[in-house]
């Protein structure tokens, strides 16, 4: 997501890959919007992100990303608007507050872990890795699995995502945890 989806040829290549694989593979997108990189191309960037969200199964957005994309309002209502575009689950991170997993029928939350923050670079990517690993561990990382996520799977995804992100932000240099640090 983010920077790689701003300029061609990378942006159109990633979008073409997503289009080609969307029917056969679980697709996750984390737009990771960086305003400094989209200045002057905001309309085309928003259009590309809109198309890619519509083809994704899983969308991860920070609260700031969601407000940029969908406007002001209640986060859960805005996330439901994202789900109306096609994805099956929205992971919504709120930094030190924690993270949400939202589907058409479920809304789950995991509070952030209290840590001394050294560096926030990589927190979102590490959350994504933890959430995806948890879904994989539960046998839910398939088109069918994502379409019928239950509370236990969402809770597991949030728990591992939040745990992994907490470890990452507690040390400098976007240094994600090893499996043994997560009890995995």
PLM feature spans:
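Conserved phosphate-binding/catalytic region of the ribokinase-like
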Residues: 19-20, 71-184
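Conserved beta-alpha-beta core of the PfkB/ribokinase-like small-molecule kinase fold
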Residues: 2-81, 97-98
